[in-house]
Every structure is written in C-alpha cells, then in structure tokens.
Amino acid sequence: DNYTVRLIQKDLPCSVVFYLGRGDRPYRPTSISLPYNTSISLLSDHFTVQCNDLLKRTSLPTVPYISIRYDENVRQRLATTKKNPDNFNILILGLDSVSRMQFERMLPKTFAYITKELDGIILKGYNILGDGTPAQIIPILTGMQERELPSTLHRDKNGSFVDVYPFIWNQYRERGYVTGYAEDGPSMGIWTLRLRGFNRTPTDHYMTP
C-alpha cells in the first residue's frame, strides 16, 4: 500500500524483482530482499515476488504483480492542472478476435458488467479498417490508418518507432490526465510483432514489460 510492498508473514523471506527500462526495449530485472515487517517503495509498475518457506524448506512459486508506482512528474502535473468537475475518467477496452455480437453471446456477464455496472458505451458503429489487430486499434487511437502514418515496420530499414504516431493519450496528458496502456499478451504485442515498438515509454503507466 502507499506505493510500497510490505512483507507481513514471518518465516517467509522474500525477494522483489522490479523490471526497469523504457518503451519496448529489454527491461533490466532488479532484485531487492524484503525482510519481515519491512516495506520498500515500488520501483516499477510491474514486479515479481519470490519467497522461501523456511519451515518447509521449499521455494514458493514466483508471483507476478501489477501496481502503480509513485511518480513525482505525474504528481506535479496533477498539482498544476486546473480541476474541471466535468472531466471524465476514460478507459478504452478492446477485445481482439471476437465480434461484438459474439462477445454479447459468449460473455454475457462481462458484457452486462461493462454496460450496466460501469455504464460503458459500446461502439456499435466501429469497424476494422484493414486486416489484423493494428488495423483495429491504430485508427481509434490516432485518428488515422497505418498507411497514412510514417512507416514503423521492422522490415523497413528507415522505419521509425511508433512514437511518431499521434496517439490520443498524448493529448490527454497535455490536459493533465494520467495515462496508461496495457496488453494481455506483450509477447505478441500490437506494436512489436511486425512494428518497431516504442522507443520511449508511451504513457505514464505502461504495463508491458
């Protein structure tokens, strides 16, 4: 809690491994021992915990976690941004490889939670503008199709990183918002499978180490 991780169980020494880096470059694991009843500040939004059971003399499975680290730059931005009661918290949720109608049929509880509990808006008129996941997501996040943007392909030796795209979160950041981006499968990432990925971390909180 409070941007820290704490060990509250005896006879269970643990190590926390933070993953430091930027953009889609290889991340550097940094391990820190976590003694009983102590806490350490989060160094990254994503980390793993490895513990040893001294009584059973066994190692427990490594557990991954996602949290929000303290970021002074973000705090300064929030402190200097004029508060507007009309501003919304905005979450864009995309599900790949499934149509809207199939989503409603196959995941009715999830659909009901999004539409009723969260009062979410379903983009009924949204259509893919090409083939593949990038053709699904690039237009809604940039307002342009991939062919209208600078080349970011791996095979293009003069290609740019996808940082050059006019992502909508850049505009939100300029207006004082805290931004974030996450994918469930970074090994097959939208921006890295056939594109060059990000050179710099694109959002305040980037959940794809």
Q: Over which residues does each language-model region extend?
A:
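Beta-strand-enriched, solvent-exposed domains that form extended recognition/catalytic surfaces
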Residues: 1-81
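Active-site-proximal alpha/beta segments of enzymes that process anionic O-linked groups
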Residues: 44, 74-78, 82-209
